């Protein structure tokens, strides 16, 4: 039997709390030296702050423009925009609240992400806070156990076909990032990818309706309260409004803006399953969505609607979320017990409703 290689734990210097920007073309088509350099930079950024920005990952500006056209809530071109369709059409594909994988439409306030922090990861008392967010979730086109809930084709022609294609493209891009993380952490090739090749991942379109600043400042409703995602990694595309913030690793409870960049810039954050696999060597990126930076000093007025799209790369349901042996030593014993990814996900998601 081959000997398990221990991963060296590096003490992280946190002088720069913001995510780095890495060019994935170096990993896609670069030399072995360039691939290694990309992987090291990728790991350095997520180790520091739980986040990294990725460019030239294979999803074009034009494709992301088309993606955001489907996310609009304006009624100008209603049959091309999901969030503008009639409420009864959304209710026809509503996501049933509960711990099963999310499929279909969730209304504003349906999910309480703040409850995901009930394990003491934050000191904020937000257990009943609600989200000013509606979203549409789709699973893998090949998922027959939990099939996606699609609006009738006559209601929004082409919506299903586009999102199913975008799901496949996003999954490929996310697996590329995971492959680079394997390399940057000196793990055996495929040890993480092999756990994420199934149909457990999810694609989410987000719409944050226009809202008064005063309402957000009262604290019982937020665009998204502080939380960590439950999967392996999240690949996010955001519009130009801003409001996404990550927690400063050296100052718990303090948050820093993650401003939008180029149209196709992909913001990648480490999620809880990755933290479990690495036995807390790489920890999940805590984040929130709040008032855009340029409006922070205002006490009144309205914040425009915000849109984003997240691809949640998740482990196969039967994959273990226990720490990999490469991250377990006598000095760093396993911090998490054996559990399947599906059981872990359902246990955690049940707290959000």
From Swiss-Prot:
One GO process term, biological-process aspect: alkaloid metabolic process
GO MF entries: dioxygenase activity; metal ion binding
InterPro entries the UniProt entry points to: DIOX_N (IPR026992), IPNS-like_FE2OG_OXY (IPR044861), IPNS-like_sf (IPR027443), Iron_ascorbate_oxido_reductase (IPR050231), Oxoglu/Fe-dep_dioxygenase_dom (IPR005123)
Keyword terms, alphabetized: Alkaloid metabolism, Dioxygenase, Iron, Metal-binding, Oxidoreductase
Residues annotated as binding 2-oxoglutarate: 302
Annotated Fe cation binding sites: 227, 229, 287
UniProt xrefs under Pfam families: 2OG-FeII_Oxy, DIOX_N
Cofactor note as given: Binds 1 Fe(2+) ion per subunit.
Pathway the protein takes part in: Alkaloid biosynthesis
Fe2OG dioxygenase domain residues: 199-315
Enzyme Commission numbers on file: 1.14.11.-
Cofactor names: Fe(2+)
Domain of life: Eukaryota
Function: 2-oxoglutarate-dependent dioxygenase; part of the gene cluster that mediates the biosynthesis of paraherquamide, a fungal indole alkaloid that belongs to a family of natural products containing a characteristic bicyclo[2.2.2]diazaoctane core. The first steps in the biosynthesis of paraherquamide is the production of the beta-methyl-proline precursor from L-isoleucine. They require oxidation of a terminally hydroxylated L-isoleucine to the corresponding aldehyde by enzymes which have still to be identified.
Family: Belongs to the iron/ascorbate-dependent oxidoreductase family.
Designated name of the protein: 2-oxoglutarate-dependent dioxygenase phqC
Organism in which the protein naturally occurs: Penicillium fellutanum
Encoding gene per record: phqC
């Amino acid at each position: 039997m081959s000997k398990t290689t221990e991963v060296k734990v590096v003490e992280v210097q946190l002088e720069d709390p913001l995510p780095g920007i890495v060019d994935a073309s170096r990993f896609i088509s670069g030399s072995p030296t360039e691939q290694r350099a990309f992987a090291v930079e990728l790991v350095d950024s997520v180790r520091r702050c739980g986040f990294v920005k990725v460019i030239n990952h294979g999803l074009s500006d034009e494709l992301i423009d088309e993606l955001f056209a489907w996310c609009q809530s304006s009624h100008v071109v209603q049959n091309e925009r999901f969030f503008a369709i009639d409420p009864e059409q959304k209710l026809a594909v509503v996501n049933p609240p509960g711990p099963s994988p999310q499929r279909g439409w969730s209304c504003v306030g349906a999910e309480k992400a703040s409850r995901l922090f009930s394990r003491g990861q934050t000191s904020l008392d937000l257990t009943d806070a609600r989200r000013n967010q509606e979203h549409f979730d789709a699973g893998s086109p090949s998922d027959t156990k939990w099939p996606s809930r699609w609006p009738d084709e006559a209601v929004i022609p082409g919506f299903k076909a586009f999102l199913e294609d975008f799901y496949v493209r996003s999954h490929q891009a996310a697996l590329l990032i995971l492959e680079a993380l394997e390399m940057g952490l000196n793990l055996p090739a495929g040890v993480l990818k092999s756990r994420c090749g199934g149909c457990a991942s999810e694609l989410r379109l987000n719409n944050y309706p226009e809202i008064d600043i005063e309402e957000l400042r009262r604290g019982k409703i937020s665009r998204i309260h502080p939380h960590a995602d439950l999967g392996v990694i999240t690949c996010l595309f955001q519009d130009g409004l801003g409001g996404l913030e990550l927690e400063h690793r050296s100052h718990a409870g303090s948050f820093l803006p993650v401003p939008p960049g180029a149209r196709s810039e992909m913001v990648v954050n480490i999620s809880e399953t990755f933290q479990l696999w690495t036995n807390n060597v790489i920890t999940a990126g805590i984040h929130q969505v709040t008032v855009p930076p340029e409006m922070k000093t205002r006490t009144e007025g309205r914040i425009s609607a915000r849109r984003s799209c997240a691809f949640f790369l998740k482990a196969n349901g039967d994959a273990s979320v226990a720490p990999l042996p490469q991250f377990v030593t006598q000095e760093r014993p396993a911090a998490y017990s054996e559990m399947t990814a599906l059981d872990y996900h359902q246990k955690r998601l049940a707290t959000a409703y």
